[in-house]
Amino acid sequence: MKKKLNLCPKGTYDFFGQSAKIFIDVRKVFFDQAKKFNFSYIETPIFEYANIFLTTNQIADIVSKELYKFFDKSGRELALRPEGTAPIMRSVAQHKLFQTEKKFFYFGPMFRYENPQKGRFRQFYQAGFEIINYKKDSLEFQILEIIVLIKSIFKDLGINEYELKINFLSNLTTRNIYEKNLAQYFEKFSDKLEPISKIRIKKNPLRILDDKIEQEKEFVKLAPKINTFWTMEDKNIFNRITSILEEFKISYKVDYNLVRGLDYYDDFVFEFIDTSQTLGTKLALVGGGCYNNLPTKFGLNNFKSIGMAFGIERLIEIIKSKKNIKEQNLDFFLLSFTDKEILLNFKLAKILRKENFLVDLNKTPFSVSKGFQLAKKSGAKFVFFFEKNQAKNYISLKNLQTGKNEQILYTEINFEYLNSIIKASENA
């Protein structure tokens, strides 16, 4: 079957117009916040050796059915990155970036072969923050920094409808005991489970707990809870975490079924869930937790780490739903009716852009009527143009909202005045 050339692949999209503008604004918020919290930017390849994403537990969803794997011309098995944490740990190990506690930030596209739907794509953007090689006794403070950072980002984005869910998965030993009990419990209900969950019973029963279909079933809601298997140390750690959240007046809800989709998480895990109904269902806007076992895969032992990642497309959808988004229009359009005027306006554009004004100009001469039609379509607030028999060194400036026309000295432009009329037009 012949594929249409004018369609992007299923599960992908093009950013343009309002979405592109919001994307740029959102990206700026993340870079600004990363700088404020002293996170260093790190960029890893879009594709890696596939084995950095593969685990002995092959039931992890992004491994079993969502990983984009391929062989290159030399027979090496590669994969498009489905998430950002494993590549960063690979980079940390490769470049020996582990002498002291490090704080990394990334922003870029990820790839998963999943069913496209609202808030889910096959190519999607994530912004992530990782704190690696921290001291064990500082866990609650690392968590506090991560949560405070998230709330600061939400504030800058104008997002205020969310709920923080938390859980504590304990260490590998305790979790193995819990998973064994969980598997025995779900065996009794195997005939009521979805096909993928029947496989999960033996491979990763934890994933049954947060499956969107399974979690609505009563017997899943009544499944054994992780907290009944906590050691005294686990209870003390969890109490310290919740106490510090309460001290900083951070609202949270304990969800013992919260496990996260990637199987390298342990200890503390969390998600911020959208409660605005913009996305249709209560999807996670950001999620993460501790991953103390993942570093061992890269030869890094006793390596405490915590991180989280935001789904950028979901943030954009929420921001788009708000009615108070202002389009960023041009400040000035420089209209030319002759080749000579085009050259003069290029010089003027350079001067105005240096002063951070938003400027565009026509590069083909137009008649007066067509020229002003073009200027209005550009969305500019004002248009500069030369009139016939105009006084030497002067140019006309027209307010496209009011129609007011005035003469400006071309050789001595008053930037303070231009700023004032731009602000006045924005408040009109």
From Swiss-Prot:
Gene3D superfamilies: Anticodon-binding domain, Bira Bifunctional Protein, Domain 2. It catalyses: tRNA(His) + L-histidine + ATP = L-histidyl-tRNA(His) + AMP + diphosphate + H(+). GO terms for biological process: histidyl-tRNA aminoacylation. It is an enzyme of class 6 (ligase). Pfam families: tRNA-synt_His. Keywords: Aminoacyl-tRNA synthetase, ATP-binding, Cytoplasm, Ligase, Nucleotide-binding, Protein biosynthesis. GO terms for molecular function: ATP binding; histidine-tRNA ligase activity. Its EC number is 6.1.1.21. GO terms for cellular component: cytoplasm. It is found in: Cytoplasm. CDD domains: HisRS-like_core (cd00773). The keyword Manganese does not apply. Homodimer. HAMAP family: His_tRNA_synth. Belongs to the class-II aminoacyl-tRNA synthetase family. This is Histidine--tRNA ligase. It comes from Mesomycoplasma hyopneumoniae (strain 7448) (Mycoplasma hyopneumoniae).
